[in-house]
Amino acid sequence: MPTEANTYDPQRIESIAQHYWDSTHAFEVNEHSNKPKYYCLSMLPYPSGALHMGHVRNYTIGDVISRYKRMTGHNVLQPMGWDAFGLPAENAAIKNKVAPAQWTYKNIERMRTQLKSLGYAINWSREFATCQPDYYVHEQHMFTRLMRKGLAYRRNALVNWDPVDQTVLANEQVIDGRGWRSGAPVEKREIPQWFLRITDYAQELLDGLNTLDDWPEPVKTMQRNWIGRSEGLEIRFEVRDVDNNALEALRVFTTRPDTLFGVTFVSIAPEHPLALHAAKSNPGLAGLLTQMKQGGLSEAELKTQEKRGMDTGLKAIHPITNEQLPVWVANFVLMAYGTGAVMAVPGHDQRDQEFANKYGLPIRQVIALKEPKNQDESTWEPDVWRDWYADKTREFELINSAEFDGLDYQGAFEVLVERFERQGRGQRRVNYRLRDWGVSRQRYWGCPIPVIYCPTCGAVPVPENQLPVILPENVAFSGTGSPIKTDSEWRKTTCPECGGPAERETDTFDTFMESSWYYARYTSPNAREMLDKRANYWLPVDQYIGGIEHAILHLMYFRFYHKLMRDARLVDSDEPAINLLTQGMVIAETFYRKNPDGSKDWINPADVNVECDERGRITGATLISDGQPVLIGATEKMSKSKNNGVDPQIMVTKYGADTVRLFSMFAAPPEQSLEWNEAGVEGMARFLRRLWTQVHHHASHGPATALDITALDTAQKAIRCKTHNTIARVEDDYGRRRSFNTAIAAVMELSNTLARFDDTTTQSHAVRQEALETMVLLLNPITPHTSHALWQTLGHPETLLEDLPFPKVDTTALVRETATLAVQVNGKLRGTIEVATDAPREHIENNALTEPNTARFLEGLTVLKIIIVPGKIVNIVAR
């Protein structure tokens, strides 16, 4: 039904449009279409209970692209689901004394309502939550396949252990080395965990990046660095104990064998077998290893912690010089990386140098410039020359390296590799920084790992006909241990191979497992198998949208899991997504007051009055409730910790969904940070009210007659030219550039131009009708509710605008018959003239000289020359 109100009423308009979309199942799609497919997907949300502005921006970008693509003739899929397992639900369960499942499903209901209020063109019939058994059963089935193929395996690995809560902690739950809830010092504990062999796909993941032409370079660079391919030499160092007995040889991988003569000690990880062996007879070392178990495992902590170590008393024999090198335990060497041992070259490596300086170990130079440019370059200082260890491009040669003196990096590399391989003491290797994916989590709220442990048969995959292994949802959750560990009825079972008593695995999957394949399940949401033939119709995703913070975890696992599904013959494609758009953050001002202890109480911007200078910069702020000053902080990402978030629902209620959508697209290009500014939101609301009034005022003059482009005068042609120029700009902005802010600006320009067009003739009414229809359709991807209503106001029946073709450029309208030229006198603007585009020079000069305001400024002056810039400027030089 058309809206008759002349006042812009967002709630009424949006209710009518959304009811129409729901009742007509407007955004349901299938695979039986002769249109080209287009799969647009924004990363699925975690059901925290409330949308934030980051969600709104992400999903609005996806919705704009989806609606635009449907208007350009595509069969568009835009689904939605919920990444529903995970730690926040457990934390909320502890805080609110409610089962994680109950908390999660309640939040999904609320967030679904919020998403629908924003009018997104989502195919809701494909919705699912990853915590539902009919979703994760397929994940369990895939895991059992991977076990049988040897791509899933179990081994011991270090975790953060809270000795009070008796639970494993994620890195983010370790605060300054202590458990976030108990406050107890966290220990590093080695426990059995399941892994997927992502390293088997390391080279393919690396090579595949070269095919992703439409992924941002920063994402591809981060993935290349995370995969970390390096070519080098694995060297065997013989090891002797304090009694000169031979122990198992130490394997060390290095990309710089040319620095071998600079090795003055060997560092090993605290968990290395040699460290544990030495500690048996060294109480001091045993005590240090116990201390090194304290603290978290995050890379950030390991990088910033104080470097600590101890001499084990063991000696590594230099493979060329036979020098006995001390073997030190060092807390910065990780057992999970490489071989857990490092040949230390403190003369040319910062970390080794800092360690050597602390413990008085030798530092030796083995690299020198061939042709030093100055005294500084020829004088060796370790804190300068350490940088050479990583610099292979400078012109240098080996020194203090026996018969290898004078060789450059490449020459030394090849000679040493050949020598070690010939002697059987080493071999060329390709190494990757990438580690196998640890998928075990010692948590309750996750997908159960489908494995049974039998004393006789060992680890046995759950048979397919016994899947899914269903996670009990109606549990009491305290945070101390996992409910399924203490649920003997759930845990105890029988071995599927021998029939004897057995127990289920009580670990659950890393939640990245669910988010690594959800995009594919949307294509076959009701399939009995993991996927069916519909997957190959929709995949790969044409446009994927999400934050760059997911570059090296989700997006890596996303690509890896797609290759697993390909190798299982579930999908045909090699990569999961063709285009990737990484949207910027939503940021906002922060305000606070300082407490006597120096801590800060963060105040929400909605509770603050601000004063601004003429440039709009905040110069002062007071708390609304007491009128007293508050301090102005930095502009930062919206977050709970800084209390600078804005509730989208409040904004939708206050301004309407289309205003919120319009601002989120107008305030910044998609890839850049968007600074929240309510004054800007109010500006968008004013524009929509003005457009509403503009259309209704036009419609009040009755229906337009047919446009006769052969009967238009100059002014009418100018409006048509502006209209079709706007179509061209917006089409490029939506389609190629993904520059939605400039698309909006172009429509605003057209609206302003039309507002100044006051001709009331029949053909002018028709020209205005075309311009207004164009604006309504161009804005439809961004402001669909308003466009839905205004299309009817312009005399059309209620319809789905996405099924109408996107406006087409009439190239004949772009041919301008006249041009507006600025007229300057001695470089200063004095007037404008309108002339035919093919007007002769004499005609242009005469019009410029006789333009009234220009003529006034020329009185008493002699014209020396006239410079004409075709189509732009006439500059009169006079004295």
UniProtKB/Swiss-Prot annotation:
It is found in: Cytoplasm. This is Leucine--tRNA ligase. GO terms for cellular component: cytosol. Its EC number is 6.1.1.4. It is an enzyme of class 6 (ligase). It comes from Xylella fastidiosa (strain M12). GO terms for molecular function: aminoacyl-tRNA deacylase activity; ATP binding; leucine-tRNA ligase activity. Keywords: Aminoacyl-tRNA synthetase, ATP-binding, Cytoplasm, Ligase, Nucleotide-binding, Protein biosynthesis. Its main location: cytoplasm.
